């Protein structure tokens, strides 16, 4: 047997194997189509209600937008309070001793901590609602998003503790 005959034999074997695989794929496709039509025939007609479902990317975008909006609100509140403090200092400079009073400072810190904890509670409740309403296939994406969110919260809490 020479090299040319061996090549022809190998090519014919490979082509027969490929032909068999193609035939098997066609049979599988036919079976799949038959199964789908059987399932459609068995099921009663359904009315489709279209609802816009959020994808994991949409959810991430909404969360990041909510975080951004909250940070903007905090910045606006800081700016407003800074402006009010400037006006307050201009109007009544003799009250500066009261501001430095430890009891007043404690009240302000307590108020700020209460606000922070309230916002933290709301964020965690939203997080739990999101985790409870998730489908099994999106679970990994949601868990990654949750881990990132919890890391963000932990960093905020650590910053508060340092102050």
From Swiss-Prot:
Q: Name one Pfam family in it.
A: CiaD
Q: Which residues form a coiled coil?
A: none
Where the record places motif MKD is: 135-145
Q: Which InterPro entries match?
A: CiaD_C
Disruption outcome: Deletion mutant is motile and binds to host cells. It shows a reduction in host cell invasion, induces significantly less IL-8 than the wild-type and has reduced MAP kinase signaling. Mutant is also deficient in maximal phosphorylation of cortactin at the ERK-1/2 phosphorylation sites and in stimulating membrane ruffling. Mutant exhibits reduced virulence in a mouse model of campylobacteriosis.
Signal peptide residue numbers: none
GO cellular component assignments: extracellular region; host cell cytosol
Its keywords, alphabetically, are: Host cytoplasm, Secreted, Virulence
Q: Which cell locations does it reside in?
A: Secreted; Host cytoplasm, Host cytosol
Primary location = secreted
Q: What function is annotated for this protein? A: Effector protein required for the development of acute disease and colon inflammatory lesions. Required for maximal host cell invasion and maximal secretion of the inflammatory chemokine interleukin-8 (IL-8) from host cells. Acts by activating the host MAP kinase signaling pathways ERK-1/2 and p38 to promote both cellular invasion and the release of IL-8. CiaD mediated activation of ERK-1/2 leads to the phosphorylation of host cortactin (CTTN) on serine residues and association of cortactin with N-WASP, promoting actin cytoskeleton rearrangement, membrane ruffling and host cell invasion.
Domain description from the entry? The Mitogen-activated protein (MAP) kinase-docking motif (MKD) is necessary for cellular invasion and IL-8 secretion. Interaction with IQGAP1 is independent of the MKD motif.
User: What protein am I looking at?
Assistant: Campylobacter invasion antigen D
This chain's source organism reads: Campylobacter jejuni subsp. jejuni serotype O:2 (strain ATCC 700819 / NCTC 11168)
């Amino acid at each position: 047997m020479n090299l040319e005959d061996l090549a022809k034999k190998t090519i014919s074997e490979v082509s027969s194997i490929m032909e068999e695989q193609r035939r098997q794929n066609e049979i599988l496709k036919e079976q799949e189509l038959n199964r789908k039509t059987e399932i459609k025939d068995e099921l009663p007609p359904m009315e489709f209600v279209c609802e816009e479902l959020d994808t994991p990317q949409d959810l991430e975008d909404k969360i990041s937008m909510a975080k951004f909006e909250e940070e903007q609100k905090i910045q606006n509140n800081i700016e407003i309070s800074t402006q009010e403090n400037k006006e307050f200092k201009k109007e009544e400079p003799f009250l500066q001793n009261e501001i430095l009073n430890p009891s007043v400072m404690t009240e302000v810190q307590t108020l700020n901590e209460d606000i922070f904890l309230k916002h933290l509670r709301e964020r965690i409740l939203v997080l739990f609602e999101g985790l409870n309403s998730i489908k099994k296939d999106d679970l990994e994406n949601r868990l990654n998003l949750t881990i990132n969110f919890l890391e963000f919260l932990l960093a905020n809490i650590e910053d508060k503790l340092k102050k």
